[in-house]
C-alpha cells in the first residue's frame, strides 16, 4: 500500500514537471485530471493539491465536455474535467429530447444541458439569473453554433413575475439560490418570471430546492422532466 502511494506520487510529480516545462493544451490538462481520478487520488490531500495547481497555473480558454467546447468558470474546471459529467442525467436528456421538441433549461448555469438539448435540434428556452454564469452560457451557445435554436434569458424562474434576491454561493456557481427575504449574505437582485409556454415537451429544472415553485408557475406542465 505504501509502495502504491509512492508510485502514484511519482507519476503525479512527473506530470507536474512536464507542465512546468511545456505550454498546456486541453488534452494534456484533461488527461492529467483523469489520471488523478483513476489512480484514486482525486479526494486525497495530494490529489486536491495537484488539481488546485493545475487550475491555477495550467488554465485553458476552453475544454471539451462530452463533445462540446465550453468556457468554464474557474470553480467548475475540476468538476467538469475530472470525470464524465453526470452520465445518468446526460443519457436521460439524449434519450428524451427529440428533433423539433420545445424544451426548457431552468437553472442553465453555463449551458451544458442547453448544448445537449440543442444538438438534438430542439427549440431550447434557457434561463440563468446569475450574470457571470449567463455570460458563459451565451458564449458557449455561440461557440457551438446553436444560436439559431436557443433562446437565452438572464432571469430566474419561479411562480411569480417580478424581482427577488439571488443568494450567491462561495463554493460553486451551480449553488446560487433564490430567496425573497435574505439579508446579511452576498446576494444580487434578479428578474424572476413564470414559464408561460403553451407547450413543453421536456424540462430540465435545477434550482437548488425550488423546483416545486417553478412547476407551480408553469402555464402547462412538461410531458417529461429531469429534476
State the predicted function of each range.
Residues 60, 101-102, 114, 120-122, ...:
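Conserved acidic-Pro-Pro-aromatic motif
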Amino acid at each position: 500500500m505504501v509502495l502504491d502511494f509512492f508510485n502514484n506520487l511519482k507519476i503525479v510529480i512527473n506530470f507536474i514537471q512536464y507542465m512546468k516545462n511545456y505550454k498546456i493544451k486541453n488534452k494534456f490538462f484533461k488527461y492529467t485530471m483523469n489520471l488523478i481520478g483513476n489512480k484514486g487520488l482525486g479526494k486525497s490531500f495530494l490529489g486536491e493539491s495537484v488539481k488546485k495547481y493545475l487550475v491555477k497555473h495550467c488554465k485553458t480558454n476552453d475544454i471539451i465536455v462530452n463533445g462540446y467546447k465550453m468556457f468554464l468558470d474557474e470553480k467548475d474546471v475540476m468538476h467538469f474535467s475530472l470525470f464524465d459529467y453526470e452520465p445518468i442525467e446526460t443519457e436521460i436528456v439524449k434519450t428524451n429530447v427529440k428533433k423539433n421538441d420545445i424544451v426548457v433549461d431552468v437553472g442553465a448555469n453555463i449551458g451544458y444541458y442547453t448544448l445537449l438539448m440543442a444538438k438534438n435540434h430542439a427549440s431550447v428556452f434557457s434561463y440563468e439569473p446569475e450574470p457571470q454564469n449567463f455570460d458563459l452560457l451565451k458564449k458557449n451557445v455561440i461557440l457551438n453554433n446553436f444560436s439559431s435554436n436557443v433562446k437565452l434569458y438572464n432571469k430566474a424562474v419561479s411562480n411569480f413575475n417580478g424581482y427577488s434576491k439571488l443568494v450567491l454561493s462561495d463554493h460553486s456557481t451551480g449553488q446560487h439560490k433564490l430567496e425573497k427575504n435574505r439579508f446579511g449574505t452576498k446576494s444580487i437582485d434578479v428578474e424572476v418570471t413564470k414559464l408561460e409556454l403553451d407547450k413543453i415537451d421536456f424540462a430540465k429544472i435545477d434550482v437548488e430546492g425550488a423546483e416545486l415553485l417553478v412547476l407551480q408557475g408553469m402555464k402547462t406542465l412538461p410531458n417529461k422532466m429531469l429534476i
